[in-house]
Amino acid sequence: MISSKLKTIIKNIFIKYKLSKDHASISADALINAELVGAYGHGLSRLRMYCDRISKKVINPKAKIKVKKISQSIAHVDGNNSIGFVAADTAIKTAISNAKKTGIGLVAVKNSGHYGLSGYYAESKQLKKV
């Protein structure tokens, strides 16, 4: 219950800073996860930093993330200076898709900001389905 209310608050803050609802939701989930696992340095304490970076145009809140297929197993994600959570989410989804087809998925990310707790992506629900 608390985390759903907290998610709504964080999501609304990110939306105020011009992130799409989807990108705000992805970002809020990652911040809350960091708090729930005790990695506070990657959680809510960073919210102001992300908002400041958006205000200073270091993070592009309207970034169009591009995925370049290198092979059936390998891809590059260009985050276009997006908030890192969204680029990382795109990367893990791309890696999973590639792995389902070929048995391995390797994705590199560039032009992206801080993406929080890396273990969040390694332990994602999507990855557990592979």
Q: Which residues fall in each region the model found?
A:
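Generic N-terminal amphipathic, Lys/Arg-enriched alpha-helix
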Residues: 1-17
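Short polybasic/polar patches that bind polyanions
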Residues: 15, 100, 126
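Short, well-structured alpha-helical segments
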Residues: 21-32
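N-terminal amphipathic, basic helical "cap/leader" segment at the start of enzyme domains
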Residues: 22, 36-46
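Glycine-rich anion/phosphate-binding loop at the beta-strand->alpha-helix junction
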Residues: 28, 104-130
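Alpha/propeptide regions of enzymes that mature by internal proteolysis
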Residues: 32, 84-110, 122
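Active-site cofactor/substrate anionic-group-binding motifs, chiefly glycine-
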Residues: 43-96
